[in-house]
Protein backbone atom coordinates (compact mmCIF):
# COMPACT_ATOMS: atom_id res chain seq x y z
CA UNK A 1 0.00 0.00 0.00
CA UNK A 2 1.06 3.59 -0.43
CA UNK A 3 2.87 5.71 2.11
CA UNK A 4 0.81 7.50 4.73
CA UNK A 5 2.52 10.82 3.94
CA UNK A 6 -0.08 13.42 3.03
CA UNK A 7 -2.74 10.82 3.63
CA UNK A 8 -5.99 12.89 3.58
CA UNK A 9 -5.38 14.45 0.17
CA UNK A 10 -3.99 11.27 -1.33
CA UNK A 11 -6.76 9.02 -0.04
CA UNK A 12 -9.50 11.36 -1.25
CA UNK A 13 -8.34 10.71 -4.82
CA UNK A 14 -8.52 6.92 -4.50
CA UNK A 15 -11.45 4.87 -5.88
CA UNK A 16 -13.83 3.68 -3.12
CA UNK A 17 -12.49 0.12 -2.88
CA UNK A 18 -8.87 1.24 -2.64
CA UNK A 19 -9.82 3.91 -0.11
CA UNK A 20 -11.43 1.24 2.07
CA UNK A 21 -8.38 -1.01 1.83
CA UNK A 22 -6.06 1.88 2.63
CA UNK A 23 -8.08 2.76 5.73
CA UNK A 24 -8.27 -0.87 6.81
CA UNK A 25 -4.51 -1.28 6.50
CA UNK A 26 -3.86 1.81 8.61
CA UNK A 27 -6.19 0.64 11.36
CA UNK A 28 -5.30 -3.05 11.31
CA UNK A 29 -1.60 -2.22 11.54
CA UNK A 30 -1.92 0.35 14.30
CA UNK A 31 -4.72 -1.14 16.41
CA UNK A 32 -5.05 -4.80 15.45
CA UNK A 33 -7.63 -6.70 13.45
CA UNK A 34 -9.95 -7.62 16.29
CA UNK A 35 -10.12 -4.17 17.84
CA UNK A 36 -11.06 -2.42 14.61
CA UNK A 37 -14.74 -2.30 13.72
CA UNK A 38 -16.23 -1.95 10.26
CA UNK A 39 -17.66 1.37 11.40
CA UNK A 40 -14.18 2.62 12.29
CA UNK A 41 -12.93 1.62 8.85
CA UNK A 42 -15.87 3.42 7.23
CA UNK A 43 -15.11 6.60 9.14
CA UNK A 44 -11.40 6.43 8.30
CA UNK A 45 -12.23 5.88 4.62
CA UNK A 46 -14.83 8.67 4.60
CA UNK A 47 -17.52 6.24 3.50
CA UNK A 48 -20.29 4.10 5.03
CA UNK A 49 -20.58 0.55 6.34
CA UNK A 50 -23.05 -0.18 3.55
CA UNK A 51 -20.46 0.89 0.98
CA UNK A 52 -17.86 -1.39 2.55
CA UNK A 53 -20.21 -4.37 2.39
CA UNK A 54 -20.83 -3.66 -1.28
CA UNK A 55 -17.15 -4.32 -1.92
CA UNK A 56 -16.47 -6.94 0.76
CA UNK A 57 -19.08 -9.44 1.89
CA UNK A 58 -17.69 -9.60 5.43
CA UNK A 59 -14.97 -8.06 7.56
CA UNK A 60 -13.10 -11.36 7.26
CA UNK A 61 -13.14 -10.97 3.48
CA UNK A 62 -11.68 -7.47 3.85
CA UNK A 63 -8.91 -8.77 6.12
CA UNK A 64 -8.13 -11.55 3.63
CA UNK A 65 -7.88 -9.08 0.75
CA UNK A 66 -5.52 -6.91 2.78
CA UNK A 67 -3.34 -9.97 3.42
CA UNK A 68 -3.32 -10.73 -0.33
CA UNK A 69 -2.01 -7.23 -1.00
CA UNK A 70 0.73 -7.57 1.63
CA UNK A 71 1.67 -11.00 0.26
CA UNK A 72 1.86 -9.59 -3.27
CA UNK A 73 4.34 -6.96 -2.06
CA UNK A 74 6.60 -9.68 -0.68
CA UNK A 75 6.30 -11.80 -3.82
CA UNK A 76 7.25 -8.73 -5.84
CA UNK A 77 10.49 -8.60 -3.86
CA UNK A 78 11.36 -12.08 -5.17
CA UNK A 79 10.57 -10.97 -8.71
CA UNK A 80 12.69 -7.86 -8.29
CA UNK A 81 15.84 -9.60 -7.02
CA UNK A 82 15.57 -12.20 -9.78
CA UNK A 83 15.31 -9.43 -12.38
CA UNK A 84 18.18 -7.45 -10.85
CA UNK A 85 20.52 -10.46 -10.63
CA UNK A 86 19.66 -12.78 -13.53
CA UNK A 87 21.53 -16.08 -13.37
CA UNK A 88 23.19 -15.13 -10.07
CA UNK A 89 21.27 -17.00 -7.37
CA UNK A 90 23.60 -16.05 -4.52
CA UNK A 91 22.99 -12.37 -5.18
CA UNK A 92 19.26 -13.07 -5.42
CA UNK A 93 19.23 -14.68 -1.97
CA UNK A 94 21.31 -11.89 -0.46
CA UNK A 95 19.11 -9.31 -2.19
CA UNK A 96 16.04 -10.85 -0.63
CA UNK A 97 17.67 -10.69 2.79
CA UNK A 98 18.54 -7.05 2.15
CA UNK A 99 14.88 -6.31 1.32
CA UNK A 100 13.88 -7.67 4.73
CA UNK A 101 16.76 -5.93 6.52
CA UNK A 102 15.89 -2.56 5.01
CA UNK A 103 12.27 -2.92 6.11
CA UNK A 104 13.07 -3.63 9.75
CA UNK A 105 12.86 0.02 10.79
CA UNK A 106 9.18 0.07 9.85
CA UNK A 107 8.60 -3.21 11.69
CA UNK A 108 9.99 -1.72 14.90
CA UNK A 109 6.98 0.59 14.99
CA UNK A 110 4.19 -1.66 13.76
CA UNK A 111 5.50 -5.18 13.55
CA UNK A 112 5.22 -7.77 10.80
CA UNK A 113 1.65 -7.82 9.43
CA UNK A 114 1.77 -11.60 8.96
CA UNK A 115 2.98 -12.32 12.50
CA UNK A 116 0.56 -9.84 14.03
CA UNK A 117 -2.35 -11.23 12.05
CA UNK A 118 -1.59 -14.86 12.86
CA UNK A 119 -1.60 -14.00 16.56
CA UNK A 120 -5.13 -12.63 16.17
CA UNK A 121 -6.46 -15.40 13.93
CA UNK A 122 -6.18 -18.75 15.75
CA UNK A 123 -8.87 -20.34 13.55
CA UNK A 124 -7.00 -21.99 10.68
CA UNK A 125 -10.14 -21.88 8.55
CA UNK A 126 -10.18 -18.06 8.63
CA UNK A 127 -9.77 -16.85 5.02
CA UNK A 128 -6.99 -14.42 5.94
CA UNK A 129 -5.04 -17.11 7.74
CA UNK A 130 -5.35 -19.33 4.68
CA UNK A 131 -3.95 -16.51 2.56
CA UNK A 132 -0.97 -16.21 4.91
CA UNK A 133 -0.29 -19.94 4.96
CA UNK A 134 -0.49 -20.18 1.17
CA UNK A 135 1.83 -17.19 0.84
CA UNK A 136 4.38 -18.68 3.24
CA UNK A 137 4.32 -22.02 1.42
CA UNK A 138 4.83 -20.28 -1.93
CA UNK A 139 7.62 -18.15 -0.49
CA UNK A 140 9.37 -21.26 0.83
CA UNK A 141 9.14 -22.97 -2.56
CA UNK A 142 10.69 -19.96 -4.27
CA UNK A 143 13.51 -19.75 -1.75
CA UNK A 144 14.22 -23.48 -2.05
CA UNK A 145 14.33 -22.96 -5.81
CA UNK A 146 16.88 -20.17 -5.45
CA UNK A 147 19.03 -22.36 -3.21
CA UNK A 148 18.79 -25.22 -5.70
CA UNK A 149 19.79 -22.95 -8.59
CA UNK A 150 22.70 -21.78 -6.48
CA UNK A 151 23.93 -25.37 -6.36
CA UNK A 152 23.57 -25.78 -2.60
CA UNK A 153 23.75 -29.50 -1.71
CA UNK A 154 20.65 -29.37 0.53
CA UNK A 155 18.39 -26.57 -0.76
CA UNK A 156 15.59 -27.39 1.66
CA UNK A 157 17.86 -27.14 4.70
CA UNK A 158 19.47 -23.91 3.49
CA UNK A 159 16.07 -22.36 2.76
CA UNK A 160 14.81 -23.38 6.20
CA UNK A 161 17.81 -21.78 7.91
CA UNK A 162 17.41 -18.58 5.91
CA UNK A 163 13.68 -18.47 6.67
CA UNK A 164 14.33 -18.87 10.40
CA UNK A 165 16.76 -15.95 10.26
CA UNK A 166 14.51 -13.67 8.17
CA UNK A 167 11.46 -14.25 10.35
CA UNK A 168 13.45 -14.25 13.59
CA UNK A 169 14.97 -10.88 12.71
CA UNK A 170 11.50 -9.43 12.22
CA UNK A 171 10.27 -10.68 15.60
CA UNK A 172 13.46 -9.53 17.35
CA UNK A 173 13.12 -6.08 15.82
CA UNK A 174 9.49 -5.88 16.86
CA UNK A 175 10.22 -6.74 20.49
CA UNK A 176 13.51 -4.82 20.62
CA UNK A 177 15.51 -7.75 21.98
CA UNK A 178 18.47 -7.53 19.57
CA UNK A 179 20.28 -4.45 18.35
CA UNK A 180 21.64 -4.02 14.80
CA UNK A 181 19.20 -6.70 13.63
CA UNK A 182 19.52 -5.76 9.96
CA UNK A 183 23.31 -5.89 10.00
CA UNK A 184 23.29 -9.21 11.85
CA UNK A 185 20.64 -10.59 9.50
CA UNK A 186 22.78 -9.89 6.44
CA UNK A 187 25.88 -11.41 8.02
CA UNK A 188 24.07 -14.61 9.01
CA UNK A 189 22.38 -15.12 5.64
CA UNK A 190 25.64 -14.58 3.77
CA UNK A 191 27.27 -17.06 6.16
CA UNK A 192 24.56 -19.66 5.54
CA UNK A 193 24.93 -19.41 1.79
CA UNK A 194 28.72 -19.51 1.90
CA UNK A 195 28.82 -22.31 4.47
CA UNK A 196 26.73 -24.56 2.28
CA UNK A 197 29.59 -24.25 -0.16
CA UNK A 198 28.95 -23.46 -3.81
CA UNK A 199 30.74 -21.38 -6.45
CA UNK A 200 27.86 -18.93 -6.40
CA UNK A 201 29.61 -16.00 -7.99
CA UNK A 202 29.63 -17.73 -11.38
CA UNK A 203 26.50 -16.86 -13.41
CA UNK A 204 24.46 -19.90 -14.36
CA UNK A 205 23.47 -20.22 -18.03
CA UNK A 206 19.94 -19.12 -18.86
CA UNK A 207 17.46 -21.90 -19.55
CA UNK A 208 15.37 -21.86 -22.72
Task: Tell where the protein language model's regions lie, with residue ranges.
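N-terminal intrinsically disordered/low-complexity leader segments
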Residues: 1-15, 199-208
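Helix-turn-helix
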Residues: 2, 19, 23-61, 65
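Alpha-helical DNA-contacting segments of helix-turn-helix folds
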Residues: 63-70, 77
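Hydrophobic alpha-helical connector segments
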Residues: 65, 79-106, 155, 159-162
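Amphipathic alpha-helical packing segments from all-alpha helical-bundle domains
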Residues: 75, 91-94, 124-149, 160, ...
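Amphipathic alpha-helical segments used for helix-helix packing
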Residues: 91-92, 106-127
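Amphipathic C-terminal alpha-helical segment
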Residues: 103-104, 163-180, 192-201
Amino acid sequence: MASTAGRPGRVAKLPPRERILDAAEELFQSEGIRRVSVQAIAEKAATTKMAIYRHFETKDALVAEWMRIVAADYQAAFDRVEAEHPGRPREQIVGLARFIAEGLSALSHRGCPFINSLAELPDRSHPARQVIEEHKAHQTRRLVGMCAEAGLPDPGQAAAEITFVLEGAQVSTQNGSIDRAGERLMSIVEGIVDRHGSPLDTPRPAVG
